[in-house]
Every structure is written in structure tokens, then in C-alpha cells.
Amino acid sequence: MRVLVTGATSGLGRNAAQWLLEAGHQVRATGRDERAGEALRQLGAEFCALDLAQATPQQCRQLVTDCEWVWHCAAKSSPWGGKAEFHRINAAATEKLAEAAGRCGVRRFVHISTPAIYFDFQPHYDLDEGYRARRFANHYAASKHAAEQRLLAQAKIYPQTTYIMLRPRGLFGPHDRVIVPRLLQQLERDRGVLRLPGGGQALLDLTFAPNVVHAMELASRQRGLPSGAVYNITNHQPQRLAEMLDALLRQELGLSYRLQAVPYPLLHTLAGGMELWATLSCKEPLLTRYSVAAVHFDMTLNQTRAIEELGYRPRYSMEEGIRLTGEWLRRQGGGQHG
């Protein structure tokens, strides 16, 4: 079986491509990092260096030709950027690829969306898939919601292709280039001090990346799923952010650090000033109001639909995920013991 994995050179896509190869599948992988792409070739993947946002409809059809599944992980998930760029990468490119999949008769198209579409600067518990923020928190959330709407439209046009959307929350694990690297940079910049609103007491649903890969496999194999269905995916273990960071940074990586509680209103105001300066200087701010709020407000997701329809249960607990992430980071030189 041949599977197309987009965004395969880092993060979730890299985990997905590696798992598929180890499971004996043929993998066609896309991404913009040619060095990481060469590593995928060494593992046995067919790698195509391609920016999907720039790809023509014909190139998209060539990508999906002879593929039974498409796992669409590619996205712009930066906390900062222009509206047009987010929509070009996250919405328009997704629509092009989804249309190509429909035209070429791909059996399953699994799209990685985001719970950011729920976020509205308030605490929430046990949110189900039907909730929407009245106003999206940033361009990223708005563009990912637009991508979902375009997939629903393709599902009506191409009924022979089943389009499934997954919303994993708070991804961490091997090949992450965003969350943990930024934490390590902050620790180095602030000399071992990690400043968080409320001292990191937010209760969050987080997800170990290989568990999302498991959910993607279930979404591809499970019979009878309605096209256009969407599922929350988490580790089923909501945890205080400070506890997760202590387990990873101190216990696994052996880093000495001090967690400093900063009042949320102060950080929110500071982030707003940084955003204003970033707009004038055209440089990404160190903080955004969204990135501050995301680690301040509690957010947990309902898992009933994923359990009942996908049969999803995490393969790795939070404890196992943190341990495996620590092992990977140590191999990459991401921490020093002692």
C-alpha cells in the first residue's frame, strides 16, 4: 500500500512517515527540508521536495497518483504571520490536495486540523467537536477552520473518497521543532528561568505524536466512517503544564531551572506590545497574546466520538511519551544531565 505523507520532514509528519515505513508500507513523502528528506530516502521513502502552497493542480495529482491514503500533516503553525500567508498554506493548499485526491480516487484523506478553532481566551473543559470560538484567536485558527470547510465541500463533490479530520491537542514528541526547542531557548536566554502565567498551573490535554499516528491509521482503516467526520485526539490524561515540564526538563533531561509565576494580565499586555513592535519591524515577536493565553487557560477535550467511532485509545501514556521524548532529545543533544 502506498501512502502520501505531507509535512513529512518534521513533527507529526516525520513520525507518521517513519511509522508507515516500519510497518512495511510504501511512503511518498513531501516537505521543504531537503536534508530531512534525504534521511527519509535512506529509510526507504520516495521523497518529493515540494512546497504545496506553490504546487500546481497537476503536481498535486501526480503526488497522489497510486496512493490509497493521503495523510495531510503539512501546515503553517507559527504563532505569527500574515493572514494571506496562513490561508494560502493552510486552506488553499489543503483544498488543492483534497481535490486532487478526489479526482484520482484516493480511498482515505486524513487531514490534521487543530483544537485552536475552539480557543477564545477562556477556560474550557470536555469540549466536543461541535464547539467553535465566536471569534478565532489568530490567523492560524481561522485558516485551519477554512481548510476544514473546504474539505467538507470536497467530500460532497467526491463521495468515493472519505475525508477525515483529526484535531490533536498540544503535540509533543520526537522530531518536534517548535514547542520543546522554544522552551530550551527560553531557558538559555533567561539563564535557567522559565516564566509562565500562573506558574504553569493550567490543566491541558496534551498528545504524544505517535498516538496521533495511531489515530491516523485508525481513521484510514476503520470502515463506515462518514466523509467529513472530525475527531478530537488527546492522550486521555489532562495534566498541569508545570508537572509535564518538570517530568521532561528536570527528570528526563536533567536540566536545573526555576519556574517563575508571572501574572497573566502582565504577560498579556507585554505580548500585545511585542505584537505591535513585530508588526512595525516585520520580525516574529517573542510572545503573542495567543501563546501566553494558551498556557494560562485550562482546556480539555471530549474523547467520546474518537473512542466510539475510531476505536481510538492512546498506545502510549503521558509517562511513556515523556520518557521517549526525553530519550530522543538526549540523542539530539537537547539536554545535559548532572
Residue spans of the language-model regions?
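N-terminal Rossmann NAD(P)H-binding glycine-rich loop of SDR-like oxidoreductase domains
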Residues: 3-23
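NAD(P)H-binding glycine-rich loop region in Rossmannoid oxidoreductase-like domains
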Residues: 50-92, 96, 100
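Conserved Rossmann-fold NAD(P)-dependent oxidoreductase catalytic core, especially the SDR/UDP-sugar
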Residues: 96-139
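Catalytic helix-loop patch of NAD(P)-dependent Rossmann-fold dehydrogenases
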Residues: 123-171, 192-195
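Substrate-positioning beta->alpha
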Residues: 177-182, 198-220, 228-229
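Conserved C-terminal active-site "lid" loop/helix of NAD(P)H-dependent oxidoreductases
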Residues: 209, 270-313
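Mid/C-terminal beta-alpha module of Rossmann-like enzyme folds, strongest
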Residues: 219-286, 323-326
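Amphipathic terminal alpha-helices
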Residues: 301-309, 313-338
